[in-house]
């Protein structure tokens, strides 16, 4: 199994505000689709609720401690240990608590860095480039729908870190 994080954060590592993304960036949604189609997304229940439905053409797994949680098209797990039982390429998809729990266990991270500062109440955990090697860094294209400068980073964990 390959275990990756996929996330977008601003310069202050904001990832959300009031259970929503603080920005609208279609390029990032397209990037997520390209990377995760055919693979597995693991997200916490509140993240799933903010999306409202399973993302198509991938396995959607929701981590929750609510025994009554059920949604068509979603597999439910109740512990972090169950993530290790998944196969294929697994993407950790948020939110904050799940990122905090998994950042030291993932092989790599796909990060969209939003070049701005947004109001937020949820954050991506701190990370340093001491532990991560930049595999690629691509500037996002700006247009009438994508007006916020952004960079797509692929970071790979350094050996022994």
UniProtKB/Swiss-Prot annotation:
**Catalytic reaction list:** (6S)-5,6,7,8-tetrahydrofolate + NADP(+) = 7,8-dihydrofolate + NADPH + H(+)
Which EC class is the enzyme in? oxidoreductase
**Positions contributing to NADP(+) binding:** 7-8, 15-20, 44-47, 63-66, 93-98
Q: Which residues form the DHFR domain?
A: 2-157
Q: List, alphabetically, the CDD domains matched.
A: DHFR (cd00209)
The EC number(s) given in the record are 1.5.1.3
Q: Which UniProt keywords apply?
A: Antibiotic resistance, Methotrexate resistance, NADP, One-carbon metabolism, Oxidoreductase, Plasmid, Trimethoprim resistance
Cited InterPro entries = DHFR, DHFR-like_dom_sf, DHFR_CS, DHFR_dom
Concerning PROSITE patterns, the annotation shows: DHFR_1 (PS00075), DHFR_2 (PS51330)
An example GO biological process term is: tetrahydrofolate biosynthetic process
Q: Which GO cellular component terms, listed alphabetically, does the Swiss-Prot or TrEMBL entry include? A: cytosol
**What lineage does UniProt assign to this protein's organism?**
Bacteria, Bacillati, Bacillota, Bacilli, Bacillales
Identify its protein family. Answer: Belongs to the dihydrofolate reductase family.
Species of origin: Staphylococcus aureus
Q: In which pathway does it act?
A: Cofactor biosynthesis; tetrahydrofolate biosynthesis; 5,6,7,8-tetrahydrofolate from 7,8-dihydrofolate: step 1/1
Mention one GO molecular function: dihydrofolate reductase activity
**Misc remark for this entry?**
There are two DhfR isozymes in S.aureus, this one is plasmid-encoded and is resistant to trimethoprim.
Q: What is this protein called?
A: Dihydrofolate reductase type 1 from Tn4003
Entry binding sites for substrate: 6-8, 28, 58, 112
């Amino acid at each position: 199994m390959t275990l990756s994080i996929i996330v977008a954060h601003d310069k202050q590592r904001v990832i959300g505000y009031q259970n929503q993304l603080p920005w609208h960036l279609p390029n990032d949604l397209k990037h997520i689709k390209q990377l995760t189609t055919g693979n597995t997304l693991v997200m916490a229940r509140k993240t799933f609720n903010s999306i409202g439905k399973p993302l198509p053409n991938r396995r959607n797994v929701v981590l929750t401690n609510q025994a009554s949680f059920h949604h068509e098209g979603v597999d439910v797990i109740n512990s972090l240990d169950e993530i290790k039982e998944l196969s294929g390429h697994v993407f950790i998809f948020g939110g904050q608590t799940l990122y905090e729990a998994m950042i030291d266990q993932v092989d790599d991270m796909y990060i969209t860095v939003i070049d701005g500062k947004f109001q937020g109440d949820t954050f991506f955990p701190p990370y340093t480039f001491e532990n991560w090697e930049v595999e690629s860094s691509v500037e996002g294209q700006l247009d009438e729908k994508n007006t916020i400068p952004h960079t797509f980073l692929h970071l790979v964990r350094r050996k022994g870190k």
